[in-house]
């Protein structure tokens, strides 16, 4: 019963909340476990990924949810040694949301959707590999992948200074009919990208 309820929180959005909130560690670990049950689907990403399901972060807002899994060996060197080719920094799983590019939702045909079975509850989630690379000007950028090796979205990275509990922290802000997801990496870098309801 407990497992089914936890799954429903993220995968079917049965618990409505007034604003985005960070999910408890217990809930988040359960969700990460469910996403990893089908390893073939989880790891079938355009760039190689090795997500750490023991250090996840998840947020929810009504029918919407996001789960971020850091790369297992994510470190400051990942960013310091970044070049033109993207290096994985993790994965983000989205429920009821899809990335945006140039003000428009990324078409469903370009996104990788994974069917998740969580203790009797079933739902589809968009799974995006996350990478870091340098743009043409040598600046760090976050690249977000769908099905193909060409990223579906990009976001500039800025340097920050702070302490954080997890390798990647995730927060969200509503903006009319869309939202902005902000990712903080190791307390050293930050990137944000827009999301909205997925294409029907």
Across the structure, where does each feature detected by a protein language model lie?
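Sec-dependent N-terminal signal peptides
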Residues: 4-13
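Residue-level detector of solvent-exposed, low-hydrophobicity positions
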Residues: 12-13, 100, 135-137, 152, ...
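C-terminal segment of classical bacterial N-terminal signal peptides
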Residues: 13-19
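Primarily secretory-pathway and cell-envelope proteins
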Residues: 19-96, 114-116, 147-200
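Mid-length scaffold segments of soluble, non-membrane domains
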Residues: 83-149
